[in-house]
């Protein structure tokens, strides 16, 4: 590809022309070209370095999909550092001034990196296609190790195809035919050979990727329709099952006699925290006895909602809380009780990690304002009885204070068996998988679209030059090949636009919040989703 543009740029009717430095451009043109290309090169380098650092510091991005994007970022970084700047220098000076060895090394690096980008896009397309069409058989084999092998093969094939031929062709034929002031691939001096490489390196891969993406799109749309039909049939019985389901879900470790309406109105309170608060309801607990000082609960189950697809991708781990029970007596070990024996309604306030700095949660015995939809989460907590005679309410019920337990926790509580509607859970899981598949397909479509837009003009000129050698001006050759480089600039932008986790990680890195722990904790408590 590149050799043909160099050939047209530095020869006239096949005869080499020696140019003086910068004689082909005016001063303002040199300044403009140098400034624009320097900015594009800088954006390319910064964008792809951000992709690599984001992958390193944020474990949420360490998915199989993103291993391929990391490989693509490596190829784009090579182009941003070496290819863009050396090619711009070559254009401005009108000749190659670094010698034949540097020329061959640069061409080998440039072609290997460019071809590796194409191969990585092919691998991503096949990975998405098999993930959609063979979810049971392919996904079991879809591991980081397998992804690493595929990435290694993509780079190895690119290296074998280009590097030996570029570096060793002159030794195979016995002489170097490229002039000293030019830089081009010796075996691409014939337009027909250049045409063949364009077909193999661009048109065939683009055709394959387009076909695969069309099939991915059709399969995704089909699954969306099937899921909509499934949700429609499930909604028929949803209203009938709602009340029993609520009663079954609202279980925890405390129980006391149901208060009257007046008592509930009197005792109603709400969760409060340093940042956010939500209403809480409950059937207050009968104290285990004046002498009981503390009791360890097996689980405290709470319910909230799945309002959107983003919530399904939030981390499943929830804060572990400590309940301080205010009553008479002092703190000391007491008896245990389990969820099967007791019943109470709780609603969890969504809190960020910073809420732990000033914990002040109050759980009231009120029983009003339940949430509309449900997401079951389990907590371990500690119940501590403190001397406070004023805290006791009617019917022996008490106010409790929720405080964070010290980390780490050895074992997370299980929430199995809490949902009484398995078909609803199955539908919800299918929706989560479908949302992730659609996000991955969107990222792939953006990358493919950018690749086709930036690489097509140059490869069209290659086809034209095969039949009409002088029909393509030198300036268009330069612009066309530079546009291929711009694809490396656009790719990180596509990742950020299509993936919220990438976008937020980029922002935090640019704001110099680069420490791994801070980045992961911030993204965790903001509920960012993983990359498909």
Swiss-Prot record:
PROSITE patterns referenced in this protein's UniProt entry, alphabetically: G_PROTEIN_RECEP_F1_1, G_PROTEIN_RECEP_F1_2
Biased composition (Polar residues): 282-291
Protein name, as recorded: Muscarinic acetylcholine receptor M5
S-S bridge residues: 103-183
Extracellular topological segments: 1-29, 88-104, 170-191, 465-478
GO biological process: adenylate cyclase-inhibiting G protein-coupled acetylcholine receptor signaling pathway; chemical synaptic transmission; dopamine transport; G protein-coupled acetylcholine receptor signaling pathway; G protein-coupled receptor signaling pathway, coupled to cyclic nucleotide second messenger; gastric acid secretion; regulation of phosphatidylinositol dephosphorylation; transmission of nerve impulse
Residue numbers spanned by region Disordered: 262-294
Glycosylation sites per record: 8
Topological domain spans for side Cytoplasmic: 54-66, 127-146, 215-443, 499-532
Modified residues (Phosphothreonine): 501, 505
Cellular component annotations (GO), alphabetically ordered: dendrite; plasma membrane; postsynaptic membrane; synapse
Recorded topology in the membrane: Multi-pass membrane protein
Alphabetical keyword list: Cell membrane, Disulfide bond, G-protein coupled receptor, Glycoprotein, Membrane, Phosphoprotein, Postsynaptic cell membrane, Receptor, Synapse, Transducer, Transmembrane, Transmembrane helix
Keyword ATP-binding found: no
Listed transmembrane segments: 30-53, 67-87, 105-126, 147-169, 192-214, 444-464, 479-498
Function: The muscarinic acetylcholine receptor mediates various cellular responses, including inhibition of adenylate cyclase, breakdown of phosphoinositides and modulation of potassium channels through the action of G proteins. Primary transducing effect is Pi turnover.
Species whose genome carries this gene: Homo sapiens
GO molecular-function terms, A-Z: G protein-coupled acetylcholine receptor activity; phosphatidylinositol-4,5-bisphosphate phospholipase C activity
Bias (Low complexity) ranges: 270-281
Superkingdom to which the source organism belongs: Eukaryota
InterPro entries found in the cross-reference section: GPCR_Rhodpsn, GPCR_Rhodpsn_7TM, Musac_Ach_M5_rcpt, Musac_Ach_rcpt
Subcellular location(s) of the protein: Cell membrane; Postsynaptic cell membrane
Keyword Calcium: no
């Amino acid at each position: 590809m590149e050799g043909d543009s160099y050939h047209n740029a530095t020869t006239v009717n096949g005869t080499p022309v020696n140019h003086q430095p910068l004689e082909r451009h005016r001063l303002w043109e040199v300044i403009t070209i140098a400034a624009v290309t320097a900015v594009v090169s800088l954006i390319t380098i910064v964008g792809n370095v951000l992709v690599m650092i984001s992958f390193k510091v944020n474990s949420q991005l360490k998915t199989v999909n993103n291993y391929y994007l990391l490989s693509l970022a490596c190829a784009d970084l090579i182009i941003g550092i070496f290819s863009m700047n050396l090619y711009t220098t070559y254009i401005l000076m009108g000749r190659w001034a670094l010698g034949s060895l540097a020329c061959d090394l640069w061409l080998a690096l440039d072609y290997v990196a460019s071809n590796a980008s194409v191969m990585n896009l092919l691998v991503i397309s096949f990975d998405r296609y098999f993930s959609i069409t063979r979810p049971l058989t392919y996904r079991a084999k879809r591991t980081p190790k397998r992804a690493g092998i595929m990435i290694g093969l993509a780079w190895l094939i690119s290296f074998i195809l280009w590097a030996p031929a570029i570096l060793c062709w002159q030794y195979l034929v016995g002489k170097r035919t490229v002039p000293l002031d030019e830089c081009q691939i010796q075996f691409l001096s014939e337009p027909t050979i250049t045409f063949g490489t364009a077909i193999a390196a661009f048109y065939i891969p683009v055709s394959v990727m387009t076909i695969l993406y069309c099939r991915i799109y059709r399969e995704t749309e089909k699954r969306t329709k099937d899921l909509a039909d499934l949700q429609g049939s499930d909604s028929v019985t949803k209203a009938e099952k709602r009340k029993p389901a609520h009663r079954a879900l609202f279980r925890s470790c405390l129980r006391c006699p149901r208060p009257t309406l007046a008592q509930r109105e009197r005792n109603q309170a709400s969760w409060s925290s340093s940042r956010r608060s939500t209403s809480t309801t409950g059937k207050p607990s009968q104290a285990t006895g004046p002498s009981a000082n503390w009791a360890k609960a097996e689980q405290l189950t709470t319910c909230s909602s799945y309002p959107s697809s983003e919530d399904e991708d939030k981390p499943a781990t929830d804060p572990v809380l400590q309940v301080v029970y205010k009553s008479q007596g002092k703190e000391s070990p007491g008896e245990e009780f389990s969820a099967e024996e007791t019943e109470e309604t709780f609603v969890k306030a969504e809190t960020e990690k910073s809420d732990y700095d000033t914990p002040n949660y109050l759980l009231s015995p009120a029983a009003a304002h339940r949430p509309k939809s449900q997401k079951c989460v389990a907590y371990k907590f500690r119940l501590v009885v403190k001397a406070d005679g004023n805290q006791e309410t009617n019917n022996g019920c008490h106010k409790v204070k929720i405080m964070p337990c010290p980390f780490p926790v050895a074992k997370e509580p299980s929430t199995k068996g809490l949902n009484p509607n398995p078909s609803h859970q199955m539908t919800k899981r299918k929706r989560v998988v479908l949302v992730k598949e659609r996000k991955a397909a969107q990222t792939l479509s953006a990358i493919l679209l950018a690749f086709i837009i930036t690489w097509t003009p140059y490869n069209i000129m290659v086809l034209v030059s095969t039949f009409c050698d002088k029909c393509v001006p030198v300036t268009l050759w330069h612009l066309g090949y530079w546009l291929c480089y711009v694809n490396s600039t656009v790719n990180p932008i596509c990742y950020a636009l299509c993936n919220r986790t990438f976008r937020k990680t980029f922002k935090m890195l640019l704001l110099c919040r680069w420490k791994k722990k801070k980045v992961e904790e911030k993204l965790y408590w903001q509920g960012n989703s993983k990359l498909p």
